Amino acid sequence: MSNKKIIKIIKLQIPGGKANPAPPIGPALGAAGVNIMGFCKEFNAATQDRPGDLLPVVITVYSDKTFSFVMKQPPVSSLIKKALGLESGSKIPNRNKVGKLARAQITAIAEQKMKDMDVVLLESAERMVEGTARSMGVDVE
């Protein structure tokens, strides 16, 4: 693949196993000339074990209209909502608290997300998770 020229990089967040040609996937890939159904089938096959998880994906489109994609870990906010069983964070995070995140949960989320974060220490990743939790109206132990 080193001889192929990259013409476009597309970043999307798609629920695992639920890629389809409807917006926003179809228009983004169609504008780049990518086979939309080919991408949807490959993505759904790769994410069939993670249904419903919101997965960031980086799609690289090459000059011959082929593509490759890299999946990342779900966003921290999504992991926090899943850990606490929430639909959404607080509308007023300073006043209305929607849950409490234990230290063990923070560490587990930080360990899972650490490969996508630009940090070396687990403690730094934990602080980033804590900050996201606070901005969502979740108390941190």
From Swiss-Prot:
One of its GO terms (molecular function) is large ribosomal subunit rRNA binding. Belongs to the universal ribosomal protein uL11 family. Forms part of the ribosomal stalk which helps the ribosome interact with GTP-bound translation factors. It comes from the Bacteria. This is Large ribosomal subunit protein uL11. PANTHER family: 60S RIBOSOMAL PROTEIN L12 (PTHR11661), LARGE RIBOSOMAL SUBUNIT PROTEIN UL11M (PTHR11661:SF1). InterPro entries: Ribosomal_uL11 (IPR000911), Ribosomal_uL11_bac-typ (IPR006519), Ribosomal_uL11_C (IPR020783), Ribosomal_uL11_C_sf (IPR036769), Ribosomal_uL11_CS (IPR020785), Ribosomal_uL11_N (IPR020784), Ribosomal_uL11_N_sf (IPR036796).
